[in-house]
């Protein structure tokens, strides 16, 4: 079962109308955007953003930890209201409204030990290499749908990094703002980023289920998010999490 976090997001302001709806945000660990403290409470950039969105919009939010793939299924059925840190895909857009504007972007990149990443200069150099990736993630076209590549999916970024560190995989794809942060905290294996950099960024959104019973509140959240992005508040919140 998912764990509901009542710490930061569960403290509702007294001015909110009694009986007002509480929207459920489903997500999983993805440092530095979403991390777990020793008390199992979430913290990180996305949590700071959600806290400010709650304050600006007056909409109560509660956070529930759910594996990423299951979270997407809950968005598809309307069991969950929101997800944060979402990359856009055509398949997801069938059941998720991507609230505008996007609030952050990262660059996809390939990582491994020096001998593994040194030959990677172009996309074509990925042929014949086993590449680790996180299941249910979106990176860039044509990689995501390229059936000619030898791709090995795992459930989480943490597991993927450990497999590369231990030599079970020689190469992995990730997003720089997540993997660079992880490596800045610990990189005993000496993992490096390949020179080849895909040209398209991974743009991150707050998404609302099209089947949410609170779908009408989407524009209110989008307006609050837009104000945060345009004022530079999101950029300010992000600075402590940048390696």
What do the predicted segments below correspond to?
Residues 60, 138-148, 152, 190-191, ...:
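Ligand-binding clefts/hinges and TM-proximal coupling segments of bilobed small-molecule sensing domains
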Residues 60-67, 149-156, 160-163, 194-196:
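Short beta-strand-to-loop elements that line the ligand-binding cleft
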